[in-house]
Amino acid sequence: MSVLSALTVCSVSAQSEKFNYDTVIATWQPRQLSIASIDEAEKILTSSRYLQAKGDERERIVRFTNIMRQKFDSLNAGQKERLVVLEARLLQGIHKFEQAKQHLNQIARFRSPAAQLLLADINVQQGNAKKAKENCEKLVGQTSFLIAFTCMVNADFSQNKDVKFLKKLSAFETYTSTVRPAERQWFYEVLADMSLQLGNAEAALEHLSQTEFEKLPISAMLVWADAHFALNNYKAVSSGFSNSVPDILTADDGLLLKWAIAERAQGIVRSEVQTQLAKNMEIRVWREDSSHAAQVATYFLEIEPNYPLALKFAEINWQYAQSLDDKNLLERARQANEVSTNA
């Protein structure tokens, strides 16, 4: 899950069609307004993590960063660093983790809390908990204590699912009353994720309820869905998303995937959601999309069984992301493919 927003205001049944690299997953009405500042660009990128995202945020920010690059020498030191971090966040968003880290080397001598948080997040996704914790430790004295401590405990837990880390983090709940809403929301999201992974879905839902549902980032909504799945409450997921998602055409694929899983568990085999998801997956398969490889693998494991394809994308995902979740996905795909091959 991304932590950076805590400091700044992841066989097809659809009808086949020809694709090229201009084929889009989502569509939107063109926007005429350009981004005016780095501050605005940061806010827009953060907004892309929420239900109200229009789907064009990334494209708009890429245009903005390209323009700013032409003016790079005229920017002051602070502006240069913020631009580099913004560009690195774009790279992280498409799982180009090594490129993102190399990009951040441009500001190695002066790294803001935002840069350290981004590096910590990338290292967690790559399965390097030790390095992630080192990044988190550099936040001490540079940002709120709650953010620094949550970052460190989250790094530890990413490679060692021990209840002691949950207890350690829970002890600092008292500090949530003095931090900004975004920091508070992230703290509870981390607590929820830990609780769920330790088998306490009820506690996970309780932590997530500290934030109004529609104001949760999509990453937290995915945890919310998994918590309900653990309780066999699939109707809550399909109903919750049906009441909250403004447009499935621009909805996040991860969210659509959870929604489709909930529908299938209720015996719903055809729906607008599943049709849209199938179209999105077909395009991602054609592109061999590495940034959504985990979602593609899960789709072909749980929605439209195609185990060789699931394994292919689990292996693609593993080339970039090596958290415990990614390892488990790869093992699931290997086992499913082996069973189907030997059947």
Functional labels for PLM-detected ranges:
Residues R49, R89, D121, N154, ...:
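Residue-level recognition of tetratricopeptide repeat
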Residues C10-L83, H95, Q102, E338-V339:
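N-terminal leader/linker segments that initiate helical-solenoid repeat arrays
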Residues L86, L118, C151-M152, V190, ...:
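Canonical tetratricopeptide repeat
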Residues E42, R82, A114, I147-F149, ...:
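Start-of-helix register in tetratricopeptide repeats
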Residues Q29-A36, R69-A77, L104-R111, C136-F145, ...:
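Solenoid-like repeat scaffolds
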